[in-house]
A protein has these predicted regions:
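A contiguous, low-structure linker/loop signature
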Residues: 1-22
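Active-site loop segments of alpha/beta catalytic cores
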Residues: 2, 22-265
C-alpha cells in the first residue's frame, strides 16, 4: 500500500504535531514487520537485514514531493521541523526498537529512492538529506546505511554523486541501471577500487522485462567481467516484475553461474 498523494498527511504547521513516536507493538504495520523478520530468523537461523524508510523519502511521502521541495526553498523552518520530527520521533526510535528485537542483525538498510537525481539536486542532498542519514548512523550505529540513490548518469562528472553515496553507505558502492548502462560499469569499478570498497551493480527491471535472453546474458557477462575483476563484487536483479519473461530470468541466472566464478590462484 502507498500513501494517498492527493491528500497529504502533512499540510500545515499544526499537522506536524501528528508526528509522534508510535507504539511499535500495536500501531499500523510495525507489528507485522517484526513478525515477518521473526519468521525469517526462525526459517534460516539468522537475523535478517533490517529495513527502514529514510527521512527524505518519508517526508516526501507524507508531505508530497513538490510541496516538500517548495518548503525547502521557501519555508525552510517548516521543512527543518518536519525532518527533525520524523528523524527523532519516528525513524530513530523504530531503528532502535528493531535492534533490540534483532540484536544480531548486521545491516540496517534505509530506502531512499526519492533522494535521487534529478528529483533533487546536489545542494539539497548536501544540506537536507545527508545530514539526517549521518544523524541516524551516529545514534543508531555504523550498521545503518542508505545505498539506493540513483541518477549519477545525469551529471557530466558522475563521481561527484558517487562521492556523496559513499558518505551514507561507506562500505560499498551501489549502482543500477539505467545509470550503469549509460555510463558503463568501468566507472563504478574504478571508483570503488580507488576508495577501497566493494561494488554492487544492479541489472534494471525494465531491461529484464523488455529484452531478449541473449541481451540479458550479455549484460550480466559484461557487468561481472568488469565489476568482478579483483573480487569484492555483487550482482543483483532489480525488482523483477511479474511481466518479466521467465526465459530472461533463466538467462540471467545461467549467465551468473557461467561467468560469476572468481579465479583462484
Amino acid at each position: 500500500p502507498d500513501v494517498d498523494r492527493t491528500d497529504p498527511l502533512i499540510k500545515s504547521w499544526n499537522d506536524l504535531k501528528k508526528i509522534q513516536q508510535p507504539d511499535f507493538t500495536s500501531h499500523g504495520r510495525f507489528p507485522m514487520v517484526v513478525e515477518m523478520n521473526t519468521l525469517y530468523r526462525e526459517s534460516v537461523d539468522e537475523d535478517p537485514t533490517l529495513n527502514f524508510c529514510a527521512p527524505f523519502s518519508m517526508a516526501a511521502n507524507i508531505r508530497g514531493m513538490e510541496s516538500l521541495v517548495m518548503d525547502i526553498m521557501t519555508k525552510p523552518a517548516f521543512a527543518r521541523e518536519l525532518f527533525d520530527r520524523l528523524t527523532d520521533e519516528v525513524i530513530i526510535p523504530w531503528i532502535l526498537y528493531l535492534r533490540e528485537k534483532f540484536p544480531n542483525a548486521r545491516s540496517i538498510c534505509g530506502s531512499d529512492a526519492m533522494a535521487s537525481l534529478p528529483i533533487v539536486n546536489i545542494p539539497i542532498l548536501q544540506e537536507w538529506i545527508i545530514p539526517y542519514v549521518l544523524r541516524l548512523r551516529e545514534i543508531c550505529g555504523p550498521g545503518v546505511y542508505v545505498p539506493n540513490w540513483v541518477g549519477e548518469s545525469c551529471l557530466q562528472i558522475p563521481e561527484e554523486f558517487l562521492e556523496l553515496k559513499l558518505r551514507v553507505c561507506p562500505d560499498f558502492l551501489e549502482g543500477q541501471d539505467p545509470d550503469v548502462a549509460k555510463i558503463g560499469p568501468a566507472v563504478y569499478k574504478a571508483y570503488a577500487e580507488k576508495n577501497r570498497v566493494a561494488l554492487v551493480l544492479g541489472i534494471g527491471a525494465g531491461f529484464l522485462a523488455l529484452s531478449h535472453p541473449a541481451q540479458v546474458a550479455e549484460r550480466v557477462k559484461q557487468y561481472i567481467e568488469i565489476g568482478g575483476e579483483n573480487g569484492r563484487f555483487c550482482l543483483y536483479l532489480c525488482n523483477i516484475g511479474v511481466t518479466t519473461p521467465l526465459e530472461n530470468v533463466r538467462a540471467a541466472v545461467a549467465a551468473v553461474r557461467k561467468y560469476g566464478v572468481y579465479t583462484v590462484g
